[in-house]
Regions:
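Mg2+/Mn2+-dependent nuclease catalytic core
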Residues: 102-119
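Accessory nucleic acid-recognition modules appended to NTPase machines
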Residues: 1-94
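Arginine/glycine-rich "motif VI" loop of SF2 helicases in the C-terminal RecA-like domain
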Residues: 64-67, 115-127
Length: 157
């Protein structure tokens, strides 16, 4: 199990930042094996599958981040606004990611990322590079609102 620390933004906002780390499986296959579940059980419990998918993607983003002198965080504030992953370089430049198992969640994830970006625009000195949604299926493309939709297969699978 690996900790994913909370991102420190130095935002001047009425919403307070949550500082606790999130925990993810470092090896999703071991988690599935220890649960003793197979393909059928995973297909019948999409909530569990979504949590496992998020851990898988975060593990891979962590590997890519380390290779590029960056770190992986999450964002969560007292208003309930949450971003699954913030990948930040030492220079302060960062990208924000939402991780969604299915393509049916893309619009809601994009709305969430755009809300996050609007808060940062007014209050944050760090430089946002891109807003991204990683999905388990579908095509990779850039939406009209400049949010990137990235299929898991584009990450090298």
């Amino acid at each position: 199990i690996e900790d994913q620390p909370a991102w420190s933004t130095h935002i001047r906002s009425s919403a307070s930042m949550r500082k606790s780390a999130k925990r993810h499986f470092s090896d999703v296959a071991l988690a599935i094996a220890s649960l003793g579940v197979g393909k059928e059980a995973l297909l019948n419990d999409l909530k569990l599958t979504g949590f496992l998918f998020e851990s898988l993607v975060i593990h891979d983003l962590r590997v890519y981040a380390q290779a590029n002198d960056a770190k992986v965080y999450h964002y969560n504030d007292s208003t309930g606004l949450e971003v699954d992953v913030i990948v930040q370089k030492n220079s302060g430049e960062f990208c924000a990611f939402e991780i969604k198992l299915g393509i049916g969640q893309i619009d809601e994830a994009a709305k969430n990322l755009l809300k996050f970006a609007s808060i940062l625009e007014e209050n944050c000195q760090k430089k946002l590079q891109s807003l991204n949604i990683i999905t388990g299926t579908g095509l990779s493309y850039k939406r009209k609102d400049n949010v990137n939709v990235i299929s898991l297969s584009s990450l090298g699978y």
